[in-house]
From Swiss-Prot:
Name assigned to this protein: Nitrile hydratase subunit beta
Originating gene: nthB
Lineage: Bacteria, Pseudomonadati, Pseudomonadota, Gammaproteobacteria, Pseudomonadales
Family the entry assigns: Belongs to the nitrile hydratase subunit beta family.
Superkingdom classification of source: Bacteria
EC number of the protein: 4.2.1.84
Keyword Lyase: yes
């Protein structure tokens, strides 16, 4: 979805700290309670089978911007999971408020219904030139906005397939399963001639891609 929750990030909130070619990783959980966020999520996903991980991601996207910036990463997943537990009838808002002793603010209601995958096309092959579909989606999507309408080259097609996130993220259990593709883009094609030379590889679901017009395969 467009806006603050775009998968590619959002301007105005500072740089994302990272270390190049490092085997040193930050501690995953900094406080004792943080691991409970994923534990609670997988109770709903695996034990109760009430929703999917993609629905949790979409519930995080449904957080009000002010609520999002005022909470930590794992807090957002607790709020998202609690939202889905209420929406699927496992608990009620009143029960949640009573247990906590105060009103617990959930994510905003979903206003989009999702969309099905594009099916019936032959898969893309390594070396194919592809173009990312230039689409603006109101609901859940796993495509960063900065690659919309951009051309790239397929480097790899995954052997595994997963439910199309734009559908399963809205509870559509019939979502088509698709591979994802590692697509290489020129940095200058994404951000203009003033950008550094180089390439960016983005993992994209099949339904986000089309064959580039008049394109010939690039030898891998």
């Amino acid at each position: 979805m467009d806006g603050f929750h775009d998968l590619g990030g959002f301007q105005g909130f500072g740089k994302v700290p990272h270390t190049i070619n490092s085997l040193s990783y930050k501690q995953v959980f900094k406080q004792d309670w943080e691991h409970l966020a994923y534990s609670l999520m997988f109770v709903g996903v695996d034990q109760l089978k009430k929703f999917s991980v993609d629905e949790v991601r979409h519930a995080v996207e449904r957080l009000d911007v002010r609520q999002h910036v005022g909470t930590q990463y794992y807090e957002r997943y607790i709020i998202a999971t609690a939202t889905l537990l209420v929406e699927t009838g496992v608990i009620t808002q009143a029960e949640l408020d009573q247990a906590l002793g105060s009103h617990f603010k959930l994510a905003n209601p979903a206003h989009a219904t999702g969309r099905p995958a594009i099916t019936g096309r032959p898969p893309f092959e390594v070396g194919d030139r592809v173009v990312v579909r230039d689409e603006y989606v109101a609901g859940h999507i796993r495509m960063p906005a900065y690659v919309r309408g951009k051309e790239g080259v397929v480097l790899h097609r995954t052997s595994e397939q997963w439910p199309f996130p734009d559908a399963i993220g809205h509870g559509d259990l019939s979502a088509a399963h698709q591979p994802t593709y590692h697509v290489e883009f020129r940095v200058k094609d994404l951000w203009g001639d003033a950008a550094d030379d180089g390439y960016v590889v983005v993992d994209l679901f099949e339904s986000y891609l089309d064959k580039a017009p008049g394109a010939q395969a690039v030898n891998a």
